[in-house]
Amino acid sequence: MTPAELRATLSLASIYGLRMLGMFLILPIFAIYASTLPDKPSGFMVGLALGAYGLTQALLQLPFGMASDKYGRKPMIYLGLGIFAVGSMVAALAMNIEGVIIGRAIQGAGAVSAVVTALVADLTRDEHRTKAMATIGGTIGIAFAFSLVAGPILNEWMGVPGIFFLTGVLTLAAIAVVRFVVPDPISSHYHSDASAAPAKLMDVLKNTQLLRLNYGIFALHAAQMAMFVVVPFAINESSHLDVNQHWKIYLPVVLVSFLLMVPGIIYAEKQSKMKQVFVAAIAVMLFAQIMFAFSIHY
């Protein structure tokens, strides 16, 4: 990569990671925080608050990508990050679960993921695009792992509303990064591997292999959100740790997960066994869910 390509990749990966950090930081603590709200929300409402961003993000991903082809990548990123910041502030000021749900939905409405990947494609050559996308993907994983540890610690300092405020402020700072650090593309054009193609939507929806993968992603994220509705309470009951101390559970779990994941990825790549490793990972997740079902009594 040239220095300009590397700068573009790292700066855009940081924007992507920061946005996901704002989504993930509340996961390990929100369910317990929600139980202290005056309206005593149900598990369904808590789950909706956690996952509302995904609903609006899914709906607006294509429109944002299409708009970026017409109005430019950076203007749409500014708009998306601005919407995300507004959603963070709405959630921070919310006095009940409905307000948090609205805030989270607004956060998701700043659906800049497709725009960011399109801008990465504009700023990198074809032979380096895979590395750039992999860097962004790695940033998402790091943001999730970091959130599990940092969320409880930040909660002790500033509480959930404070975390939402912090997310909003950092998002506004990210706009400055896009403006002054991310290079301006010489031209923005369609990339078959990174840009939205509405005309091919029906072809995608009819592709059974893609549908299987899409369902797998949906199931993974649905299970992830559902787990964080109950796991914080389960940790409280089994370990008697305060929610601010839950990082003591999450940190070793994250470290062990990375240690187990890396050899699997290396083996899959070197031996061309990606599907087998993928299926094995699903089996491990299924086993873990069954264990949770018999061990969590909350």
Stretches found by the model and what they are:
Residues 1-5, 183-216:
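Juxtamembrane intracellular "pre-TM" segments in multi-pass secondary transporters
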Residues 28-43, 229-245:
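Short amphipathic helix-loop junctions that connect adjacent transmembrane helices
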Residues 54-62, 144-145, 254-262:
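Residue-level signature of mid-helix packing/kink "hotspots" within the transmembrane helices
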Residues 59-95:
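Conserved MFS/SLC helix-loop-helix module at the cytosolic interface between two early adjacent transmembrane helices
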Residues 60-71, 260-273:
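Helix-to-loop junctions at the C-terminal end of transmembrane segments
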Residues 70-80, 269-282:
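Cytoplasmic membrane-interface "Motif A"-like loop-to-helix N-cap segments
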Residues 103-141:
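Cytoplasmic helix-loop-helix junction between adjacent transmembrane helices
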Residues 169-188:
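C-terminal membrane-cytosol helix-exit motif in multi-pass small-molecule transporters
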